Amino acid sequence: MASRPIVLRFESRNGQFRLTVNPQDLFPSLQPQILERLPPNVDPSSITLSNRPIGTGGEERLLNSLDGVGFDKVGLKHGDKLFIGYQENQGQQNGTANGHITPSAGDASRRLNGAPVPQSETATIKNPWDVVQQSPLDDMLDKKDGKIKRGLDTKFCRHGPKGMCDYCMPLEPYDPKYLAEKKIKHLSFHSYLRKINASTNKAELNSSFMPPLSEPYYRVRRDCPSGHPQWPEGICTKCQPSAISLQPQEFRMVDHVEFSSPDLINSLLDFWRKSGAQRLGFLYGTYEEYKEVPLGVKAVVQAIYEPPQVDEVDGVTLHEWPNEKEVDEVAHLCGLERIGVIFTDLLDAGRGDGSVICKRHIDSYYLSSLEIAFAARMQAQHPKATKWSRTGRFGSNFVTCVLSGDEEGAISVSAYQASVAAVEMVRADIVEPSAEPSVMLVQSEDDDTENKSRYIPEVFYRKINEYGVSAQQNAKPSFPVEYLLVTLTHGFPTDASPLFTDSSFPIENREVIGESQELVHVAKKLVTHGDPDKAIQAVSDFHMLCFLHSLSTFNKDEEALLCRVATQRAPADGLQLINTPGWATLVTILQESGERPPKRPWLPTPEPYPPRSVPYNPGKRSLPSSSSSSHLRPESPKSESERLAKRFKGASLE
């Protein structure tokens, strides 16, 4: 009596299929049916069968080696599953046979004017969070555990020194009780990241990674899939932004701002003391770990560069900065980057004791609506790269500092950041500064009658009403600026070790108070009476490095060596520097300009390296353009409208 047919299941890396066989059939009889269900370039002699997935330690046998073996002899029953492994024919896969190129059927059908068109490789589109390059600091903080360790609680712990209970187990970095106890108002960025990632990517689900962060987007999406005309001709619920509900941001991208030396602040204040006008400068430094806050980040300021500007009693106006890229390049050679901006808002109290008027306090404002809009524009120009965001970037580490009077009449520093929502609202042109510094205005679509490209969504915020209840309010026409502001801490190191140890070189763009950068200042700093250590100390000045860069006397390698001498101050590097052709060119320029050049033996003009010729007019150096502050004296505001003018109109989004 013939046996009833059985169904066997087969699985390969191409998928699964079933075959109906007789128990008395032999294994090699399945080869034609198996080849029909595998790719065409499979080598038939490489087909392998196994009782487990290929490569996991099962009993793997070549199909050709099972000649004479039937299914009933190995105990296979109805519904059993076998795993198939195979190798592809490399010669056919690469399109070669016996050393000749053989076009495939697909290539043969692809022709242009009778000539075959080779098929191009398919470009793999990767997710932004897979290819983005984070900073080394973020990579280091991502690897940290971040939990807050606690000691034994003598009141509640009942176990030994090696035990652990609920009263002494480590806390998460976002634990609300710990933050309230330490009076930490905002979570650090990486603590906030741990908090939201714990609910987005749960380890027990074994699901694929999804970035927990997403940047807010308050503009009309141009890539709407609904098929209607683009805005402003058409709009739907898929492309229009949702209503905005403002609330104070619970985290901050940077927790602390540290100035490496008090001289940085004093040099900026000197301009106000001499002119009575305000001043603005960009902060250059690094980002480091801030251990006072769980997984915290601090911005360490090493230098302040003052760009071209027009300074007035009530504010400043930024002008075009022609050498912006050059200054950033010098900072990069010194291991620095632009990390923030600082400006003064000072008014003398008139008592003759150096006290100033306190304009920023709890009953007025801390950062005006105009300054928040300026900070938001600056942060939009310096986004933060992170693999935890769907777009590959989120927020910004750019900080904004203000020098103003406190309630005691002393000059103090305050550090802030605009919230992530504030940056997007400014980018989407939803808000605009108000004449009242403590409120921000919401734009109206009626104001844009000529250009209908702007869409203003509904904006709401919550406040405590007259009955003591938190109620939702419509933000139009204005709302408090506190909803767009994040406060940071600031301070100075206990043991100061600034990167640049000299600050005697004149600061740039100060011709309005009679200070300019000239070659005579370079000559004076380099005349060190034969002491190399003093010369190394002299070039350790960021403003001098930027001035030397403008002379174009050093090539890239020599300038990198100069910046290394300025930051590391190694005597060996200093001696190597003075024997470079660029240094010889600098000495020649000083001689031709009539300035006093260095005359000591340690600063000779090296004979093997003839000085390079550079385009330079002796005794004359080009000054900033007519738009710079060197041609304008600080003036007092003549009307109320000038006092309320947009003082930072020079800054704009790219």
UniProtKB/Swiss-Prot annotation:
It is found in: Cytoplasm, Perinuclear region; Endoplasmic reticulum membrane; Nucleus membrane. Residues 620-631 have a biased composition (Low complexity). One of its GO terms (biological process) is protein transport. Residues 592-654 are annotated as: Disordered. Residues 600-613 have a biased composition (Pro residues). GO terms for cellular component: endoplasmic reticulum membrane; nuclear membrane; perinuclear region of cytoplasm. It is a peripheral membrane protein. GO terms for molecular function: ubiquitin binding; ubiquitin protein ligase binding. Keywords: Cytoplasm, Endoplasmic reticulum, Membrane, mRNA transport, Nucleus, Protein transport, Translocation, Transport. Residues 257-394 form the MPN domain. SUPFAM superfamilies: Ubiquitin-like. Residues 632-645 have a biased composition (Basic and acidic residues). Belongs to the NPL4 family. Involved in the import of nuclear-targeted proteins into the nucleus and the export of poly(A) RNA out of the nucleus. Has a role in the endoplasmic reticulum-associated degradation (ERAD) pathway. This is Nuclear protein localization protein 4. It comes from Aspergillus niger (strain ATCC MYA-4892 / CBS 513.88 / FGSC A1513).
